[in-house]
Amino acid sequence: RCQYHPKALRRYRGQPSPHGSNPHQIKKGLSPMEHKNCLKKVTAVFSSHEAAPIWKLRHFAVLALLTEIGGELHFILTKRAAGVNQPGDVCFPGGHREQGETLVETALRETEEEIGISQKDIRLLGKSDFMLTIYRGMIQPYIAYIPYEIYKTAVPNPKEVAEIFTVPLRFFLKTEPERHDTVWKVIESPDFPYEKIEGGKNYPFSKSKTTQLFYEYNGHIIWGFTAQVLRNIIEILNESKLKF
């Protein structure tokens, strides 16, 4: 053990103190040997430790699904049903990873559950960049393709999806999103122990500014995480120097 724990002082009459004439004098610090052993143990632990988030992350995956309509690629998007979180928002099929799943398995399963497209009919193309949210979530988008004949068989699960529609890839390639800033700030609970921190109630808690992106297409507002993912996909395509 790294911390030195002396034996309890003998307080019975007639028994000498193990610490000399002063019974309240306690040995402090580590001996050279104890220090060396402690360092070995710390080294053994951290030399093989794999770094991970201090806060446990919730993992999600979505499928940026493409199909071909009239000779050009379209993204398949959904509008969330009234009975789920963020009702009415436009999003990709996807959801929370279940125990034992890989993230790509999550994306494929959720797509089948939400819009009825069989996993065997989906051609996986790759993945775009992932996003870390302020809610301790990690969201991984995957890029995939289905033929138009398969897309026509898509049926929204009414418990989760109100509508399925498509937007041309070309629209996002040629359209700059609107940008609006939001500021996230700390709101302390009523019993927050201000007396324990320097500055008390005047402590300068950090604020976080986030730029929200907005696309509008045929009456649909696409914003939030979905807009961020679409913009990231477009940036990756543009960085490739290929013509689309």
What is the role of each PLM region?
Residues 52-75:
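Conserved N-terminal beta-strand and adjoining loop/helix that marks the start
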Residues 96-222, 231-232, 236, 242-244:
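Unchanged
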